[in-house]
Amino acid sequence: MIYITPIAQKHFTKLLAGKKPGTQIRVFVVNPGTVHAKCNVCFCPPEEFKTSDVVIEFDLFSVHVDSVYVSFLKDAKIDVMINELDSQLTIKAPNATKECNNTRNNMNNDLLEDRVRNVLQFQINPQLELHGGSVSLIRITEDLLAVIKFYGGCNGCAMASYTIKEGIETTLKNLFPELKGVLDMTQHQHGTHSFY
């Protein structure tokens, strides 16, 4: 389903060496089945493995793909171009823009908790990953509050409360008007792991 070139596999293996043990790679599509479809890659720690994941095994790591994205990632190719200054990841997914009505309808009909979890994983976490952090949904309360927990560089970060109100809560409430707000259950401990 997804082909990763040998040089890209080496690149991922090197990046994963500095991550929490058991962390793998996740490949996903933002706006699948539209002309705005964009494929992305992020780290996937063990606590974010999902039962709906399709797991593709490579020699030194595995790639997790939520089953709703499988048809969009058929025949995808991941490569990396390395020059003297930097490296550039390239993802070619010829089916990412193709409409798959059943899949898109299933995505829209997911439980609120699943839809919120997908937004955190596929929209919020790629941004937080730039700071070495991530956020997970713990649960949605009966009062329709999303209970979240920060990990990595976001734990203890002085900007965490701003990130919650201006970033996460605003995004989630715009997408899911039924949500009343976001609660952070992280035991924030500022340390060398904290981004700011």
UniProtKB/Swiss-Prot annotation:
Cofactor note as given: Binds 1 [4Fe-4S] cluster per subunit. The cluster is presumably bound at the interface of two monomers.
Biological function: Involved in iron-sulfur cluster biogenesis. Binds a 4Fe-4S cluster, can transfer this cluster to apoproteins, and thereby intervenes in the maturation of Fe/S proteins. Could also act as a scaffold/chaperone for damaged Fe/S proteins.
Biological process per Gene Ontology, one example term: iron-sulfur cluster assembly
Pfam families in alphabetical order: Fe-S_biosyn (PF01521), NifU (PF01106)
Family statement: Belongs to the NfuA family.
Gene Ontology molecular function: 4 iron, 4 sulfur cluster binding; iron ion binding
HAMAP family: Fe_S_biogen_NfuA
Cross-referenced SUPFAM superfamilies: Fe-S cluster assembly (FSCA) domain-like, HesB-like domain
Chain sites annotated for binding [4Fe-4S] cluster: 154, 157
Swiss-Prot/TrEMBL keywords: 4Fe-4S, Iron, Iron-sulfur, Metal-binding
InterPro entries, alphabetized: Fe/S_biogenesis_protein_NfuA (IPR017726), FeS_biogenesis (IPR000361), FSCA_dom_sf (IPR034904), HesB-like_dom_sf (IPR035903), NIF_FeS_clus_asmbl_NifU_C (IPR001075)
Protein name (database record): Fe/S biogenesis protein NfuA
Coiled-coil segments: none
Phylogenetic placement of the source organism: Bacteria, Pseudomonadati, Pseudomonadota, Gammaproteobacteria, Enterobacterales
Cofactor(s) annotated in UniProt: [4Fe-4S] cluster
Quaternary structure and partners: Homodimer.
Gene: nfuA
